[in-house]
Amino acid sequence: GTSQTVDWDLSEMNSQTINLKVNTDHNVGIRFINSSDPNDIEDITLEVIAEADEHQVFYEFADVSVNVTSASNDTKDGGRGVLLNSVWNASSIGTGLVRVYLIHEPTNFNATTRDGLGGNNDVAIDIPVSIVG
């Protein structure tokens, strides 16, 4: 398959578009990098893995329908996938956004909405999504 890397830059508040093919499984990995100090770039993903019981990645889609499941290589906490590695499958063609959250200390890991998860946003970013046939 093909691979795509999409960067989101806080200083520019924009991102490249994530391109998906409809009705196809896409293996998605996410990393959180703090590059606010170019002399001390920090991979926050390592902290999320070490503190998996205190974190959850959540994907909220607008104007597109995408099913997200935990990948077999995802970081797990008691069987629950943190969603650092996930599988996405879009059910229809279209364009929209995915809002990516890194949630600190969620209160309900089984919730299906951002509000239902509780906790605080460590990260909340919007990335354009394009789904083609």
Task: Name each model feature, range by range.
Residues 1-133:
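First exposed extracellular module after export/assembly in secreted or surface-exposed proteins
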